[in-house]
Swiss-Prot record:
<protein>
    <recommendedName>
        <fullName>Peptidyl-tRNA hydrolase</fullName>
        <ecNumber>3.1.1.29</ecNumber>
    </recommendedName>
</protein>
<feature type="binding site">
    <location>
        <position position="74"/>
    </location>
    <ligand>
        <name>tRNA</name>
    </ligand>
</feature>
<feature type="binding site">
    <location>
        <position position="120"/>
    </location>
    <ligand>
        <name>tRNA</name>
    </ligand>
</feature>
<dbReference type="GO" id="GO:0000049">
    <property type="term" value="F:tRNA binding"/>
</dbReference>
<dbReference type="InterPro" id="IPR036416">
    <property type="entry name" value="Pept_tRNA_hydro_sf"/>
</dbReference>
<dbReference type="Pfam" id="PF01195">
    <property type="entry name" value="Pept_tRNA_hydro"/>
</dbReference>
<feature type="active site" description="Proton acceptor">
    <location>
        <position position="23"/>
    </location>
</feature>
<keyword id="KW-0694">RNA-binding</keyword>
<comment type="function">
    <text>Catalyzes the release of premature peptidyl moieties from peptidyl-tRNA molecules trapped in stalled 50S ribosomal subunits, and thus maintains levels of free tRNAs and 50S ribosomes.</text>
</comment>
<dbReference type="InterPro" id="IPR001328">
    <property type="entry name" value="Pept_tRNA_hydro"/>
</dbReference>
<keyword id="KW-0378">Hydrolase</keyword>
<feature type="site" description="Discriminates between blocked and unblocked aminoacyl-tRNA">
    <location>
        <position position="13"/>
    </location>
</feature>
<comment type="subunit">
    <text>Monomer.</text>
</comment>
<dbReference type="GO" id="GO:0005737">
    <property type="term" value="C:cytoplasm"/>
</dbReference>
<feature type="binding site">
    <location>
        <position position="72"/>
    </location>
    <ligand>
        <name>tRNA</name>
    </ligand>
</feature>
<feature type="binding site">
    <location>
        <position position="18"/>
    </location>
    <ligand>
        <name>tRNA</name>
    </ligand>
</feature>
<comment type="function">
    <text>Hydrolyzes ribosome-free peptidyl-tRNAs (with 1 or more amino acids incorporated), which drop off the ribosome during protein synthesis, or as a result of ribosome stalling.</text>
</comment>
Length: 199
């Protein structure tokens, strides 16, 4: 029987050298949710830091798990699939938060299904769950310069940090990402898209 829990997974890379990098937008947004709903993380089978909480909005309570995979980005699916199988959480109750280079910094797009858009963490989750039909909160980090060394530029870009102006805007942006995940859970995907995608 499917669980009534939701699973929110914020993607990133573990370890201090990746803290505060563009690729760790998911981790940072998960930390905002953890603080907001008093979630404490502990180890899940060496695959993820996992916590459990209850959200209360508009007089409704929703139980959820909050995960930060420890597998490194490209194997994120191992962690998400393990947690969803262990706790019997269906894909339609999964929200994944991740960085997205196709969106300018500060923009958020909510979607379910569709292409992984070149994001290796999403490709891994699609593969491990056997479906792309889960909700995603795409957090814009802007684009590396194209050119002869496009791949290297991209890697350096996502593993780089934010400039001073962006750092100032980051707390509000992360709070918006957390709001987007909550809106999906409480009001549904279409409402979340209406609220966040047009900004």
């Amino acid at each position: 029987m499917a669980s009534d829990f939701w699973l929110i997974a914020g993607l990133g890379n573990p370890g201090s050298k990746y803290e505060g990098t563009r690729h760790n937008m998911g981790f940072m947004t998960a930390d905002v949710l953890a603080e907001r709903w008093s979630v404490n993380f502990s180890d899940h089978k060496g695959l993820a830091m996992l916590g459990k909480g209850v959200m209360n909005l508009s007089g409704r309570n929703v139980k959820f798990f909050l995960a930060k995979p420890l597998t490194y980005m490209n194997e994120s699916g191992n962690a998400v699939a393990s947690i969803s199988a262990y706790y019997q959480i269906e894909p339609d109750h999964i929200v994944v938060i991740h960085d997205d280079m196709d969106l300018d910094f500060g923009r958020i797009k909510v979607k379910a299904g569709g292409s992984a858009g070149g994001h290796n963490g999403i490709k891994s989750i699609d593969r491990s769950l056997g479906t792309p039909k889960y909700a995603r909160v795409r957090m814009g980090v802007g684009h590396a310069q194209r050119g002869a060394h496009a791949h290297d530029n991209t890697v350096n870009w996502v593993l780089g940090g934010f400039g001073p102006d962006q750092r100032k805007q980051l707390p509000e942006f992360l709070a918006d990402g957390a709001d987007a995940a909550e809106t999906i859970i409480f009001d549904g995907l279409a409402k979340a898209q209406e609220r966040f995608n047009g900004r």
